[in-house]
From Swiss-Prot:
It holds the Pfam family F-box. It comes from the Eukaryota. PANTHER family: BNAA05G37150D PROTEIN-RELATED, F-BOX DOMAIN-CONTAINING PROTEIN. Coiled coil: none annotated. SUPFAM superfamilies: F-box domain, Galactose oxidase, central domain. PROSITE patterns: FBOX. The lineage of its organism: Eukaryota, Viridiplantae, Streptophyta, Embryophyta, Tracheophyta. Residues 49-95 form the F-box domain. Disulfide bonds: none annotated. This is F-box protein At1g52495.
Length: 423
């Protein structure tokens, strides 16, 4: 038996070795904070010395273009001219986005985690190795997780809900969330819901959100547009140049070269729906158009369909029990399509019939939404090489619920670009 002193000494040694890693991490963190504070002090000292020195505006812009995005976010507070250059000047924002596109693409996406609350987003950048399992902290989700839809356009993410009257724009670069105002005189109900689509007009440099409100009881449909960055931020009601029977479905749309593409269905009455159509919305002119598609694309045997941007071309993927078909619109003016059909072998853990997206390299990927104690997995299928790969990301959640509603919402972006524009 150990004496009291020996047991106390052994316990002290145990605590020492147990706490050493924590102490080291704490000291490293404090050291990095001190280094950051020192750099900021040096920069402020440099600014004070340069108060009376006049630098040409073009030279300032060129210097700022060389800085990393994280530094640019800090330097917004230097002065109003700097803030305007970094966040509002179009040529500067475009140059940062172009620089981001020139960087070698990552095999793994940037993950956007959403708590099913429009004001609660957080981002995990995937610069890690595929062989590792990086840990991320995931907050428990709320009910109606599948009522949210996400659309990514030029560094921005639009999160909307067909159940709730709310729309949020999120910029992962600036970590800024912008909840849009509610549409006037609109009360959502089981018989009245809305679908939103996000687009960009490169001619006028405007980001717009299109909302289509459908009332299945009154058999009416109204159209509303919100333009980001205007002095009077509010929804505008527009006149839709399409039949009121054509209503949008709950699937996410895609914006390519100033045109939003989405899927619509022809309504026969309050309960029954007919054939499917591909529709487009020109972001600049705010007009709707029909898109000519192959008849087999809307086969009743297809259970899942999804739209995507494939190297600047509109793509549509559909699946049935045996096959998956990829359709690519090779010519937007003539609306000519090409097709690749392939069968999928059974792959443990990955259901590629549940389409999540496609990488710039042409890999189809499917994501599983984990429960509180399961890792997040991304499954990839290379169409050309007919090969699979699986990426697992460990997640830590608050283990307070064990219901299916605890599934988190994860949005993966493979062609992410940094956008310094302030919302």
């Amino acid at each position: 038996m150990f004496s009291v002193n020996k047991r106390t000494q052994a316990f002290s040694v145990f605590l020492f070795f147990f706490s050493v890693p924590k102490v080291i991490r704490y000291l490293n963190k404090q050291r990095s904070l001190k280094e950051e504070e020192k750099r900021l002090e040096e920069f402020q000292l440099l600014l004070s010395k340069l108060k009376d020195v006049h630098l040409p505006l073009d030279l300032i812009v060129e210097i700022l273009k060389k800085l990393p995005t994280k530094s640019l976010m800090r330097f917004r507070c230097v002065s109003k001219p700097w803030s305007f250059i970094i966040s509002k000047r179009r040529d500067f924002v475009e140059s940062i986005m172009a620089r981001s596109l020139r960087q070698p693409p990552h095999k793994l996406p940037v993950f956007i985690f959403h708590q099913c609350d429009p004001g609660t987003f957080f981002t995990v950048s995937s610069t890690f190795s595929q062989s590792t399992k990086p840990k991320v902290s995931i907050m428990p989700g709320r009910n109606h997780y599948n009522a949210f839809r996400y659309q990514y356009v030029r560094g921005f993410i639009c999160c909307s809900s067909s159940v709730y009257d709310l729309v949020t724009i999120y910029n992962p670069t600036t970590r800024q969330c912008l909840p849009l105002p509610k549409i006037e005189s609109m009360v959502l109900s089981p018989k009245r819901h809305k679908h939103c689509y996000f687009g960009y007009d490169h001619v006028m440099n405007e980001y717009k959100v299109l909302a289509m409100v459908n009332d299945s009881q009154e058999l009416t449909q109204t159209f509303h547009v919100f333009t980001l960055g205007r002095d009077c931020p509010q929804w505008r009601k527009i006149r839709g140049n399409i039949d009121y029977e054509l209503i949008s479905v709950s699937r996410a749309g895609v914006c390519i070269d100033g045109t939003i593409y989405y899927v619509a269905v022809r309504r026969k009455d309050n309960e029954n729906y007919g054939e499917l159509f591909m529709m487009s919305f020109d972001v600049k002119s705010e007009r709707f158009y029909h898109v000519r598609t192959p008849e087999t694309l809307w086969s009743p045997k297809c259970t899942e369909r999804g739209l995507f941007n494939h190297q600047g071309k509109l793509g549509c993927i559909s699946s049935n029990e045996n096959n998956i078909s990829m359709w690519i619109m090779e010519n937007a003016e003539k609306q000519e399509w090409s097709n690749i059909t392939f069968g999928l072998l059974e792959y443990p853990g990955g259901d590629f019939r549940t389409f999540s997206g496609i990488t710039p390299a042409g890999e189809i990927f499917s994501m599983c939404y984990p429960f509180y104690n399961m890792p997040l997995c991304v499954h990839y299928y290379n169409v050309k090489q007919k090969s699979y790969r699986r990426v697992e990301i460990e997640s830590t959640r608050l283990k307070t619920r064990k219901q299916p509603r605890d599934i988190i919402r994860v949005f993966a972006i493979h062609d992410f670009v940094e956008n310094t524009m302030w919302l």
